[in-house]
From Swiss-Prot:
This is Potassium channel toxin alpha-KTx 6 OcyKTx4. It comes from the Eukaryota. Its main location: secreted. Keywords: Disulfide bond, Ion channel impairing toxin, Potassium channel impairing toxin, Secreted, Toxin. Blocks voltage-gated potassium channels. One of its GO terms (cellular component) is extracellular region. GO terms for molecular function: potassium channel regulator activity; toxin activity. It is found in: Secreted.
Length: 14
């Protein structure tokens, strides 16, 4: 799981 500097976490699914 990745989290951006904003406040969003998501799985590496591009």
């Amino acid at each position: 799981i990745r989290c951006t500097g904003s406040k969003e976490c998501y799985s590496p699914s591009y």
